[in-house]
Amino acid sequence: MKKVTKSTAKHSVNRRRFIKGAAAGAAGAAMLVGDQAVTAQTQSGNPDQSANISSEDGGANGNEGVGRSPKVDSFIVENPGSDYMVDVFRALDLEYCASNCGSSFDGLQESIVNHGNNQMPEFLTCLHEESSVAMAHGYAKIAGKPMMALFHGTVGLQHATMAIYNAYVDRVPVYMAVGLDYDGPVSAHNATDLAAIVRNFVKWDHQPNSLTDFGRAAMRAYTLATTPPMAPVLLVLDAAQQKAPLETAPSIPRLSLPKFPSADINSVKEIARLLVDADNPRINTGQAARTQEGIDLLVELAELLQLPVDGVNNRLNFPSRHPLQGTGTGVPDLILNLEPGARIGTTPSTPR
């Protein structure tokens, strides 16, 4: 990768200025072509056609602005609010944003590409919203941190629902955002309470009413998503906030990383005593061994006490080829469930 020095950056082409200049140049070229066409028609000896063009243009003396197209107001925002949003996402260490493009977040997409140079996050174009969430789902399980998925209005969020539910059931943090554009081209793609579509299977949702509120909400969403039990979160982003010019950007709030819950020392000592005194103990992992360190410690405990460990199929909590993997033999007289939902294969009448 080419290293960008100060001198290189100084002479680099700013993407937004280039696009702005190209648009202005294209408009000027179009006006020039129009003038040349009118001149050619006038020289060809067709005064009637020339007079019609002059009158349609509405010039005060019939000759001013002959042949020029009506002026179209350009919409250019130098510092949109979406630039601040990208800076916040970068502070959250969101590497990728998977999305099926939509008009309700074109401001944010433009800022990702031009303000953020398509890095942190990098915009990944997907053919379907369900694919976007599925990519973020798998990324979180491998990388150990959330990835962003971005949707367009009601239609995009509805397309994503099955994949969101899968992540919710699997307890995987997916950082999601959906665009809401009340003045957009299709009003049917909006809703008064857009997040209601998925509220029953996301951990938290919020629609910021200002950029300052967005900064706080973005940080809180990340903290809640990564706090066990982990789950997807959703932010509803108003298109007007994305595109509104910003004179002074709010400060980016600090991220408060969650601390994983753990048992107190007295409870740990009691569990150790019960395991040592038991004749045929067993451990049910559930989804508790979340990291490689957790797996290594669980293997060390199992080998120390020579007890079987019953993992689950949807997540690696214990090596599948380890001799102690499984339910063991006979009926256990003690079962240690590492989380409440880990009582697999047990009934109220089975041992404690």
List each language-model region with its residue ranges:
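N-terminal alpha/beta PP-like core and its mobile active-site loop of ThDP/TPP-dependent enzymes
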Residues: 2-11, 20-34, 39-352
